């Protein structure tokens, strides 16, 4: 699907060294489509970043939920949860830039707030496991 291709390309562009601010013009050029074609799938660049954040949340919390269901030992849960987050960032350097907020500096502030909510939820899950 084109939406997934757009998000994958955006994430790949974020992996590039020195990728400060990614423009829709650069993204459309990389995909060899018009900017209008991007906007047929996403109303704004902020929505594209929201798509990446959705992917991050789904990926990380699906694994965390599996850890909580399978492991009764709180220390094991916390260790595995930390490992999940670190390995996700390592395997997805473009997404790690979104998670750290580096890729969101010049974007809509609600995206930074959304990543903060992700980490609040992550921290809450860690605390819950330690109770």
Features from the language model and the residues they span:
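Residues within the helices of the helix-turn-helix
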Residues: 25, 36, 46
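Short coil/turn segments at alpha/beta junctions that flank glycine-rich nucleotide-binding fingerprints
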Residues: 16-20, 71, 92
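Short hydrophobic/aromatic patch on the recognition helix
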Residues: 32-42
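Ser/Thr-centered, proline-biased regulatory motifs
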Residues: 20-29
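Alpha-helical structural segments
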Residues: 4-12, 16, 29-30, 47-70, ...
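A helix-boundary/kink motif common to multi-pass secondary transporters
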Residues: 18, 43-44
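Amphipathic alpha-helical segments used for helix-helix packing
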Residues: 90-110
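Short acidic, glycine/proline-rich loop/turn micro-motifs
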Residues: 64, 109-112
